[in-house]
From Swiss-Prot:
Protein name per its UniProtKB record: NADH-quinone oxidoreductase subunit K 1
Gene: nuoK1
Top-level EC class: translocase
Entries under NCBIfam families matching the protein: PRK05715.1-2, PRK05715.1-3, PRK05715.1-5
Keywords per UniProt: Cell inner membrane, Cell membrane, Membrane, NAD, Quinone, Translocase, Transmembrane, Transmembrane helix, Transport, Ubiquinone
GO biological process: ATP synthesis coupled electron transport
One Pfam family in the UniProt entry: Oxidored_q2
An MF annotation (GO) of this entry: NADH:ubiquinone reductase (non-electrogenic) activity
PANTHER family: NADH DEHYDROGENASE SUBUNIT 4L-RELATED, NADH-UBIQUINONE OXIDOREDUCTASE SUBUNIT ND4L
Family named by the database record: Belongs to the complex I subunit 4L family.
Catalytic activity: a quinone + NADH + 5 H(+)(in) = a quinol + NAD(+) + 4 H(+)(out)
Length: 103
């Protein structure tokens, strides 16, 4: 019978995913890439919540992850609508070119 995967592996994966999300958020100039980086950070935090919830044999982490996913889905819908509107008005997705709300 196989042994279970250690908790530290999940937390390490979560830290790596979060670091990649932060790097993408800080160093990329495309709005879509920045948006995906934010979602990656949210999913890394969700992985940590589920890992700690599993370790402590409680359901709270799973429930909190569910609520984070619901909020992230709503944020994705609104965020993508805003991104589409910005692209329609400016014809670019570069953050440096979209620096104000004025036309």
């Amino acid at each position: 019978m196989m042994n279970a995967v250690p908790i530290s592996w999940f937390l390490t994966l979560s830290a790596i995913l979060f670091a990649l999300g932060v790097a993408g958020f800080l160093f990329r100039r495309n709005i879509i890439t920045v948006f995906m980086s934010i979602e990656l950070m949210l999913n890394a935090v969700n992985l940590s919540f589920v890992t700690f919830s599993y370790q402590h044999k409680e359901v709270a982490g799973h429930l909190f992850t569910f609520f984070v996913m619901v909020v992230a889905a709503a944020e994705a819908a609104v965020g993508l609508a805003i991104i589409l509107t910005v692209f329609k008005n400016r014809s670019t997705l570069n953050i440096d070119d979209v620096n104000s709300m004025k036309n």
